[in-house]
């Protein structure tokens, strides 16, 4: 049995249970002649149990016969950091100038555990450092060990 020929990949960030044919989903899928309604239904069914509106990075694989498959990744680190710091937006200034909130090292470790499947490391300490770096770039101060 041969595998289907891959036509391309589409990377989108889609809110959980919020896929609609409107931009950016509709135009991205329409260009590759994918059934937009079928994708939206499948995606919304797959994310039904999640908290509505969580941003989910999604990789859509489009095949030559216009069929598709998709892989949902974990939400961005920035989503978790904003949630733990209880802020709505990160700093627009450089990390030394404006601190908009604080997260603990334990928070960063907890986020790293959640993000491990999508990070390019298998070491929890290295993953924690990646998350701490994301926090610093958002204007969050990391307190604790």
From Swiss-Prot:
* Assigned keywords, A-Z: Methylation, Ribonucleoprotein, Ribosomal protein, RNA-binding, rRNA-binding
SUPFAM superfamilies with a match to the protein in the record: Ribosomal L11/L12e N-terminal domain, Ribosomal protein L11, C-terminal domain
InterPro entries xrefs: Ribosomal_uL11, Ribosomal_uL11_bac-typ, Ribosomal_uL11_C, Ribosomal_uL11_C_sf, Ribosomal_uL11_CS, Ribosomal_uL11_N, Ribosomal_uL11_N_sf
Molecular function (GO) terms for this protein are: large ribosomal subunit rRNA binding; structural constituent of ribosome
| Signal sequence, renumbered to the chain | none
For the keyword Mitochondrion, the answer is: no
Outline what the protein does. Answer: Forms part of the ribosomal stalk which helps the ribosome interact with GTP-bound translation factors.
Q: Which family does it belong to?
A: Belongs to the universal ribosomal protein uL11 family.
Q: How does it assemble?
A: Part of the ribosomal stalk of the 50S ribosomal subunit. Interacts with L10 and the large rRNA to form the base of the stalk. L10 forms an elongated spine to which L12 dimers bind in a sequential fashion forming a multimeric L10(L12)X complex.
Write the protein's name.
Large ribosomal subunit protein uL11
């Amino acid at each position: 049995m041969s595998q289907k020929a891959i036509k391309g990949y589409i990377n989108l960030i889609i809110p959980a249970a919020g896929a609609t044919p409107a931009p950016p989903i509709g135009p991205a899928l329409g260009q590759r002649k994918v059934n937009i309604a079928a994708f939206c239904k499948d995606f919304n069914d797959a994310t039904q149990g999640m908290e509505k509106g969580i941003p989910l990075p999604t990789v859509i694989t489009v095949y030559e016969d216009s069929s598709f498959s998709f892989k949902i990744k974990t939400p961005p680190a920035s989503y978790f950091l904003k949630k733990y710091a209880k802020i709505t937006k990160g700093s627009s200034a450089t990390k030394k100038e404006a601190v908009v909130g604080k997260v603990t090292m334990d928070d960063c470790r907890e986020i790293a555990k959640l993000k491990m499947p999508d990070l390019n490391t298998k070491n929890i300490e290295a993953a924690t450092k990646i998350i701490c770096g994301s926090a610093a770039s958002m204007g969050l101060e990391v307190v604790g060990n």
